[in-house]
Curated annotation (Swiss-Prot):
Entries under SUPFAM superfamilies matching the protein: S-adenosyl-L-methionine-dependent methyltransferases (SSF53335)
Native species: Ralstonia pickettii (strain 12J)
Gene: trmB
Pathway assigned in UniProt: tRNA modification; N(7)-methylguanine-tRNA biosynthesis
Polar residues compositional bias, start-end: 16-26
Region of interest: Disordered: 1-58
EC number annotated for this UniProt entry: 2.1.1.33
Identification of the protein by name: tRNA (guanine-N(7)-)-methyltransferase
Region (Interaction with RNA): 170-175
Length: 257
């Protein structure tokens, strides 16, 4: 089945009606045709890469973008250091949140996965402007990156911020945060590693909480929804939504061990 063409926005451009590229097509759910679907971490969306974004890709891509391969990633070689915590982000939108967190946590290494070229260019532009050295980018389906490049039990954290809510009920099965995929994510965490999801779609927030709570290898860090961790910034679109009375929910679980 081909990826569904649908516009969207990332964690730096969020409303309940318009979210980022993350989605899921679950083999357990099945397609409308009756055939099983594989999990896919994105939808294609239209968007023009600006001159500045393209320049950043051309000039900074060779240093900060990593090719997708079917071999395990050598983090130490990719980041030029050893011993840093390893954080994996699925779908970083236009990259403002990723850049902010990486600056706030310079001792951690961040691998962001995003297929939307304008978003990749935007994050590379921020990397150059702010002289950020602890981010690397892979432009590929995050599900395949996780399966092929990230060995199990090697991640200190996973971020999934504002995935597509697929708010129509008949599309709910396309959501990324479902039990089979969460089990995969948990398998790639180290004991004590965390999985942090955030959404501004309340019904999806409750689904996230239910799904993560049902994963036996994970435990909640809070009684229900978590307070927003200090490292996750409030974006301008989130502020606008909060002024309009829209909520934002964070769910943070840790790997038992």
């Amino acid at each position: 089945m081909q990826p569904i063409e649908q516009p969207g926005t990332g964690p730096d451009d969020i409303t309940p009606e318009s979210q980022d590229t993350n989605t899921a097509e679950s083999a357990e759910s099945g397609a409308e045709t009756g055939h099983p679907r594989r999990i896919r971490s994105f939808v294609r969306r239209a968007g023009r890469t600006s001159t500045g974004q393209q320049r950043a890709i051309n000039e900074l891509g060779p240093r900060f973008q990593l090719p997708y391969t079917t071999e395990p990633l050598d983090w130490d070689a990719a980041f030029g250091r050893a011993g840093a915590k390893r954080i994996f982000e699925i779908g970083f939108g236009m990259g403002e949140t990723t850049a902010h967190i990486a600056q706030l946590r310079p001792d951690d290494d961040f691998l962001g996965v995003e297929v939307h070229e304008p978003g990749v260019g935007a994050l590379l532009k921020l990397i150059g402007e702010r002289e950020i050295g602890n981010i690397r980018i892979v432009s590929h389906d995050a599900v395949e990156v996780l399966a092929q490049m990230i060995p199990e039990g090697t991640l200190d954290g996973i971020h999934v911020f504002f995935p597509d809510p697929w708010h129509k009920k008949r599309h709910n099965k396309r959501r990324l945060i479902q039990s089979p995929f969460v089990a995969r994510l948990a398998a790639h965490l180290k004991p004590g590693g965390y999985l942090h999801c955030a959404t501004d779609w309340e019904e999806y927030a409750h689904q996230m909480l239910e799904v993560l709570s049902s994963e036996p290898t994970l435990e909640n860090t809070a009684d229900g929804f978590a307070p927003r961790p200090d490292y996750r910034p409030v974006t301008k679109f989130e502020k606008r939504g909060l002024r309009l009375g829209h909520g934002v929910w964070d769910v943070v679980f840790r790997k038992r061990g």
